[in-house]
Amino acid sequence: MPRKGPAPKRPLVVDPVYGSPLVTQLINKVLVDGKKSTAERIVYGALEGARAKNGARSRGHPIKKAMDNIKPALEVRSRRVGGATYQVPVEVKPGRSTALALRWLVGFSKARREKTMTERLMNEILDASNGLGGAVKRREDTHKMAEANKAFAHYRW
């Protein structure tokens, strides 16, 4: 095992269009085979489309609202105690909750039936900002699992 400890977190380069590290993370999640410009085109197209479809109905960008609706507060982790494995509910750290939310958003976008990835991502963002869609359902399922296993919370570490 290495003795140096964990590698330091590298600062995220903000994207040039929105100046947001969140958008940079989203681009990196969409990225396939190192094709960064293609990933940027998909993400920027989806964000512009989401803003256009959302219109002046709400202030702020739909991606922020979508992320708030997707980020999990609790999750379950397996803990082995005396031969039995318990699903122990634990709070999710902010960095992990963002990473999970982006992973779910992109994953459920890929599973959608629209023609282009830009449309899929845009519609998943719009659904998530309205509290619908697969990513929001995954968050609800995660919270339900944590609630159902609340009895094992004392095994937290």
Swiss-Prot record:
Pfam family, one: Ribosomal_S7
Gene Ontology CC: small ribosomal subunit
Keywords: Ribonucleoprotein, Ribosomal protein, RNA-binding, rRNA-binding, tRNA-binding
Molecular function as annotated in GO: rRNA binding; structural constituent of ribosome; tRNA binding
Ribonucleoprotein among keywords: yes
GO BP terms in the entry: translation
Assembly behavior: Part of the 30S ribosomal subunit. Contacts proteins S9 and S11.
Function (record text): One of the primary rRNA binding proteins, it binds directly to 16S rRNA where it nucleates assembly of the head domain of the 30S subunit. Is located at the subunit interface close to the decoding center, probably blocks exit of the E-site tRNA.
Similarity comment text for this entry: Belongs to the universal ribosomal protein uS7 family.
Name listed for the protein in its UniProt record: Small ribosomal subunit protein uS7
Source organism per UniProt: Micrococcus luteus
